[in-house]
């Protein structure tokens, strides 16, 4: 069953971080970055916040920095990228460019259930933001 993500621009994700006292280590902008990179997936939000705190601790920072967040977002994105072949990456680039996604195709369903593509509504599908941040550029078309 695909994950229906919460829109990361809404306050729900921020309230989760606030309830978990995440803002004690995060600035407002850093919290917004974590919400954005999570794509609205609660599991990813919590993982990113926890991993950013660990990253900051290991680096000897007193609080989470934007670089800590970039590092853990890249790690999450790389995890989603792992195992994707050229065809799947082509599908993701097509989705990003056209905003069109056919859920009747088996390859597309696989991208949905593995959270590489997030469903915000029945007509709003997006590439997971952490994956998008590390995705290789599209192959140039041959002449």
Predicted regions: what they are:
Residues 12, 41-61, 119-140:
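Repeat-unit-sized solenoid/scaffold elements
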Residues 1-31, 35-37:
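The catalytic "switch" region of P-loop NTPases
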Residues 6, 27-80:
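Amphipathic alpha-helical "lid/sensor" segments that cap RecA-like P-loop NTPase cores
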């Amino acid at each position: 069953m695909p994950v229906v993500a919460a829109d990361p621009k809404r306050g729900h994700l921020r309230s989760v971080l606030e309830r978990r006292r995440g803002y004690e280590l995060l600035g407002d902008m850093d919290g917004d970055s974590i919400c954005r990179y999570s794509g609205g997936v609660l599991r990813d939000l919590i993982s990113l916040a926890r991993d950013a705190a660990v990253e900051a601790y290991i680096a000897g920072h007193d609080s989470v920095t934007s670089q800590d967040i970039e590092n853990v977002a890249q790690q999450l994105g790389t995890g989603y990228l792992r195992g994707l072949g050229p065809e799947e990456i082509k599908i993701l680039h097509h989705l990003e460019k056209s905003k069109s996604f056919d859920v009747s195709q088996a390859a597309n369903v696989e991208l949905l259930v593995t959270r590489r593509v997030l469903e915000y509504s029945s007509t709003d599908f997006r590439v997971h933001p952490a994956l998008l941040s590390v995705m290789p550029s599209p192959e140039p078309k041959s002449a």
